[in-house]
């Protein structure tokens, strides 16, 4: 289906096609009861049940709201930023392994603001460090490694020299939990949770049920959590690892700061919705008139086929 709109000297063409579920290599989907614990050292596995990449946009209930641009102006978007319950561990073996279960008591845990880096937030007034050490390096990774093509095969838990920061805190793990409720006017819609930035790997649970995992710390991770929700109070748990196999590709000239460092939010869409949008502008040979081609992918998450949807 193609539609052409004329606005002044700008010609806009909208092309709509159905979404074909062809996941990128490394993205897997399915019902998994629990993680194996090896996902953060498995380069062939990029994500479980994470949405395929798409343009960054938000659902709005009305054109007037959309013109305000920011997602806070949509009733179908809800921020989860703020205080989360938090536990810090110096290595994976020391983490609280069952914290995601809703009956697990986290009342004595500290609160940490999201977004933030736990290394920075943990710096005390006297200069002591409650949640590990901020580490700066240039190109290298912060864990023991060798400069060779297949070095990633050795993983991130190798024993470094004793004077390295990661000798004592081998691979820090942050356990995050908080409660939330779904607005009543979201009934019948698909609900997603989005993590805009988590360094460098995390597992996700909703109401004690394992949802999936994500790598690639600088890109948004979206998960459809509709099947895991319940009426009233819901609980989200995220287990964040400082280092993972993805860290080999994220070795930049910067401080290495683990944590949930960008916004976390919920959003909802109708069963039939735009999954992705690609806008391509162009000018004619005289640079006088312009064209804008918008390719849109629509997706139907309903159990029945939809015809002539508008």
Predicted segment positions?
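Accessory carbohydrate-binding/adhesion or oligomerization-edge regions at the termini
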Residues: 21-155, 235-243, 266
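Accessory beta-strand-rich segments of carbohydrate-active enzymes
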Residues: 23-48, 66, 70-71, 85-89, ...
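Bacterial N-terminal signal peptides
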Residues: 7-15
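Beta-strand-rich binding/interaction modules
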Residues: 206, 289-310
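Bacterial N-terminal signal peptides that target proteins for export
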Residues: 1-6
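Sec/Tat signal peptide C-region and signal peptidase I cleavage site
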Residues: 16-20
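Short beta-strand segments of immunoglobulin-like
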Residues: 278-285
């Amino acid at each position: 289906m193609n539609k052409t709109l004329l606005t002044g000297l700008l010609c806009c063409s909208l092309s709509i096609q159905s979404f074909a579920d062809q996941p990128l290599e490394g993205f897997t989907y399915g019902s998994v009861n629990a993680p194996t614990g090896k996902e953060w050292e498995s380069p062939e596995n990029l994500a479980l049940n994470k949405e395929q990449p798409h343009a960054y946009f938000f659902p709005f209930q009305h054109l007037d709201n959309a013109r305000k641009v920011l997602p806070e102006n949509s009733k179908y978007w809800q921020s989860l930023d703020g205080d989360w319950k938090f536990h810090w561990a110096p290595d994976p073996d020391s983490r609280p392994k069952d914290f995601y279960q809703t009956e697990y008591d986290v009342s004595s845990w500290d609160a940490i603001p999201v977004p933030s880096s736990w290394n920075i937030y943990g710096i005390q007034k006297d200069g002591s460090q409650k949640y590990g050490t901020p580490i700066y390096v240039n190109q290298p990774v912060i864990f023991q490694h060798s400069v060779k093509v297949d070095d990633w095969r050795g993983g991130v838990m190798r024993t470094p020299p004793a004077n390295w920061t990661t000798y004592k805190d081998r691979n820090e793990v942050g356990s995050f939990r908080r409660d939330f409720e779904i607005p009543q006017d979201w009934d019948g819609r698909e609900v997603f949770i989005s993590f805009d930035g988590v360094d460098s790997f995390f597992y996700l649970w909703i109401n004690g049920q394992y949802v999936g995992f994500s790598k690639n710390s600088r890109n948004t991770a979206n998960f459809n959590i509709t099947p895991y929700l319940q009426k009233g109070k819901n609980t989200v748990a995220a287990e964040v690892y400082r280092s993972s196999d993805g860290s080999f590709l994220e070795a930049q000239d910067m401080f290495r700061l683990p944590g949930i460092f960008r916004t976390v939010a919920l959003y909802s869409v109708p069963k039939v919705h735009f999954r992705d949008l690609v806008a391509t502008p162009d000018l004619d040979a005289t640079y006088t008139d312009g064209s804008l081609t918008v390719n849109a992918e629509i997706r139907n998450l309903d159990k029945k086929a939809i015809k002539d949807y508008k």
